Amino acid sequence: MAFGWIDEQAELRRRAGLVRTLRPRAAGTPPLDLASNDYLGLARHPEVTEGAARAARTWGGGSTGSRLVTGTTELHTELERELAGFCGFEAALVLSSGYAANLAAVTALAPHGTRIVSDAGNHASLIDGCRLARGTAQVAAHADPDAVRKALDGHDGPAVAVSDTVFSVDGDAALLARLAEACRAYGAGLVLDDAHGLGVLGDGGRGARTRPDSRAPTTSS
């Protein structure tokens, strides 16, 4: 069989206890969820659900095309304008998911010849972005700006450091001020995934980047 190896790999994963099973939630399930990313409880907020329903009635159930062709609506541009203003950026770009945003950011900012220094605790989407980018990825010890400096030292070409602001698995935070200082010292860019900081940290929930000790030129997804 051409794909017989799939069954073999599946059996190995089963024996190792790595098989995961989906557990669908029923409508009306009591909203006690200790594993959710919905920190602020906005997913069920009446204004959010009504806004989503109103948008569906106005624009339909899908974009009907890619953003570059026919898929961009006034809602997209309005949201991007408001997000940029809220976060203090010149502009914002909304993608379909955080995973897509990280792949887009890393691959766009790490062309051929770029040294990519990725934190060992980064989310899988950042790791995949590093793998897909045309630069050369090097993993640095978790939350260790000195390790980032060491990885950047001696590289003459373009370089970028990639890190979560708040790491989703352990819940600890990157040392942003020192990380930004290391990047400035070596002329490297800094890409931050603030998915778990935006709305929770910073002035008015504007994200980890807005903390007084961590201001730095960044790209946040």
Segments predicted by a language model, with ranges:
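N-terminal "arm"/small-domain region of PLP-dependent enzymes with the aminotransferase-like
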Residues: 2-61, 188, 220
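Conserved N-terminal alpha-helix of the aminotransferase class I/II PLP-enzyme fold
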Residues: 50, 58-97
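Short, structured coil segments at secondary-structure junctions
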Residues: 112, 132-134, 186, 216-217
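Active-site phosphate-binding strand-loop segment of PLP-dependent enzymes
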Residues: 138, 142-192
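Conserved active-site segment immediately N-terminal to the catalytic lysine
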Residues: 187, 196-198, 205-221
